[in-house]
């Protein structure tokens, strides 16, 4: 445990220079991917490479990170070649880890800005409607949204307003007013965003299906490994339970934010289990345990949040 704590707290030597460029080091990527690999995943991976990794090297593998380091020492993975790692993750159906096999740092999601904006805008719209207030106070709610707030700037709406060209011919004052009125965005016409949801059901473990069914009597170690590799790949493909990809449309920021929080805290996963893991699916897999994997694209959420924030800003315009 002390060694694990030491490795988690220390920075890899090659990572100091790459942090300035927004990149992970190869070993930091091993840490990220390896922590998500279960002990069963590591056992299956070690079983596939039993002819490549010697007994001493295999005895040092205690987790996913150690296995990836062993791949690097065998020359099967480096900063410019992740093909072997990606292929192995697909074989053990850990498609949820594929986006993490990269040296590019993932942007952190900061929902605090949304919370702050929703809180301020709710004060702005609810306060004037309060019946207990004896006299209206219009200047006070306008101060709740500071002018330097970062989401107040809306260049996209401005570009839309400037994208329409004036009509040909002479321009009168009346036509200018009509055109100005038509260019002004209608608050009722809200922008919507699509969030892609990926749901996949798979077996919890594949070790029992692989044992006794993967065999090769070829003399060459490399040919023997490839034959075992192809056999395991065929078996795992036959055990594929399928996946579903759907786009969910949102028009309200509160619903989008609630959806993202349910995804982060696992509530969405628990709710989808009752929908996708049905009795017919349980009967099809028999006594084997199955699990559900849910993935939502972080970039879709960020872009959708920006669109819906612009809707709120258009509503706030006088």
UniProtKB/Swiss-Prot annotation:
Functional note: A scaffold protein that directs CASP3 to certain substrates and facilitates their ordered degradation during apoptosis. May also play a role in mediating CASP3 cleavage of KRT18. Regulates degradation of intermediate filaments during apoptosis. May play a role in the general transcription machinery in the nucleus and might be an important regulator of the activity of GTF3C3. Inhibits DNA transcription in vitro.
Keywords: Apoptosis, Cytoplasm, DNA-binding, Nucleus, Repressor, Transcription, Transcription regulation, Ubl conjugation
PANTHER family attached to this UniProt entry: DEATH EFFECTOR DOMAIN-CONTAINING PROTEIN
GO MF annotation, one: DNA binding
Pfam families: DED (PF01335), TRADD-like_N (PF20694)
Protein location: Cytoplasm; Nucleus, Nucleolus
Protein name: Death effector domain-containing protein
Quaternary organization: Interacts with CASP8, CASP10, KRT8, KRT18, CASP3 and FADD. Homodimerizes and heterodimerizes with DEDD2.
Biological process per Gene Ontology, one example term: extrinsic apoptotic signaling pathway via death domain receptors
Disordered: annotated segments: 128-191
Assigned GO CC terms: cytoplasm; nucleolus
Domain DED: 25-103
Protein source organism: Mus musculus
Gene3D superfamilies per the UniProt record, alphabetical: Death Domain, Fas
PTM annotation: Exists predominantly in a mono- or diubiquitinated form.
Lineage, broadest ranks: Eukaryota, Metazoa, Chordata, Craniata, Vertebrata
Tissues expressing the protein: Ubiquitously expressed.
